[in-house]
Structure formats: structure tokens, C-alpha cells
């Protein structure tokens, strides 16, 4: 059986162009998409019609939940209004590089602008936002390093996809890092449920 890709292993990072800082991971992303659309023109001739080429438009899009202190959501909203150039990475965290890229992961690299920020809120719900990011030119394939802050956040969740093989069994630190519900026995009165 094929080893299917798990969407949770795809990590989306952004960085404002020109800043010498680690890229920021989008948190609480619930949906992600990447589309490429070719705008081709057809020209009719006496020998039939043919495509004259055209341009390709690439767009990243997604939906993320918001949380108190979510500065990144504000940053994306400002980037749409202020037309700020951003770098972006789509990293496949389960596909490590080889040889000189052994500490990195398969990735796509983009440069472009955030074109849409839409806040969505409903009664008794969790706020979320949708974004669209328009890619300048063609994306590049390569391998990317996950910033230390990102790897710490991923490890702190204690939960990631594990394969069925013994080589990827849940053991050691991964096992003890999984958050578990706990009851503080000092606050429970006997007979109480």
C-alpha cells in the first residue's frame, strides 16, 4: 500500500522580505491550498487554431484559527493593506534531504504578496481568517531548514503522524511528551465524581 501524505506534515512559513529573522510558521492552519493556473490564448488561423502561450498565475491560500496574542494574523492583514513583499515556504517535514541537505526537508520557495485577508467570526465560535498569497514568477524547488522555534513547537505538541513500521514507532521522548489529562488527587474528595 502506498504511504499517503498527511496534511499535518506540510508546514507553511512566511518572512517579510528583507528581514534577517527566522521564518514564522502559520499556526492553527485548518486548510491550505496551492494552485497554478495558465492563462492561454487561442488564435485562429486558416489551418486551425493554436495556443499562443500566456502567463501562469500561482496562488497559495489557507484558513487558520486565531488566538489571543496572534501577531502573525495582524501581520498578514497589514501586509495586504500595505502591499509588503513576503517570502514563503511550503515544507514537507516527512521528506528529509540527502547528502549535503540531510538536515533539511523538501520544500518549495516563493516570493510574492498577500492579496487577501478575511476575518470570519460567528457567535460562540473561534475566530479564523482566510488568506491568499500571490506568487511572483515561478516558485523554486529545494530543501529548507526548519527554524529551531518551529521544531520546538512541533515537538511540544507531542503528536505527529507515525508510520506503521518499527523504524518509526512512538518511543522515548516522543512518547513521554504527549499531553495527558491528569487529576490532582489532592483536590478530589472521596466519593466525588
From Swiss-Prot:
It is found in: Virion. The keyword Chloroplast does not apply. Its main location: virion. Keywords: Viral tail protein, Virion. InterPro entries: Phage_69_Orf23_MTP, Phgtail_TP901_1. One of its GO terms (cellular component) is virus tail. Transmembrane segments: none annotated. This is Putative tail protein. It comes from Staphylococcus phage phiMR25. The lineage of its organism: Viruses, Duplodnaviria, Heunggongvirae, Uroviricota, Caudoviricetes.
Amino acid at each position: 500500500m502506498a504511504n499517503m501524505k498527511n496534511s499535518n506534515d506540510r508546514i507553511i512559513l512566511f518572512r517579510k522580505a528583507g528581514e534577517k529573522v527566522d521564518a514564522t510558521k502559520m499556526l492553527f492552519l485548518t486548510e491550505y491550498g496551492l494552485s497554478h493556473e495558465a492563462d492561454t490564448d487561442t488564435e485562429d488561423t486558416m489551418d486551425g487554431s493554436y495556443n499562443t502561450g500566456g502567463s501562469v498565475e500561482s496562488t497559495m491560500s489557507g484558513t487558520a484559527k486565531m488566538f489571543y496574542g496572534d501577531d502573525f494574523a495582524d501581520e498578514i492583514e497589514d501586509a495586504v493593506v500595505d502591499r509588503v513583499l513576503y517570502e514563503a515556504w511550503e515544507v514537507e517535514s516527512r521528506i528529509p534531504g540527502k547528502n549535503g541537505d540531510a538536515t533539511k526537508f523538501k520544500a518549495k520557495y516563493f516570493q510574492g504578496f498577500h492579496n487577501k485577508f478575511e476575518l470570519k467570526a460567528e457567535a460562540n465560535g473561534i475566530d479564523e481568517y482566510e488568506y491568499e498569497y500571490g506568487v511572483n514568477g515561478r516558485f523554486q524547488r529545494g530543501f529548507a531548514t526548519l527554524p529551531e522555534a518551529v521544531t520546538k513547537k512541533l515537538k511540544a505538541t507531542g503528536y505527529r503522524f507515525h508510520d506503521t513500521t518499527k523504524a518509526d514507532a512512538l518511543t522515548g521522548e516522543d512518547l513521554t511528551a504527549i499531553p495527558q489529562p491528569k487529576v490532582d488527587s489532592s483536590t478530589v474528595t472521596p466519593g466525588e465524581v
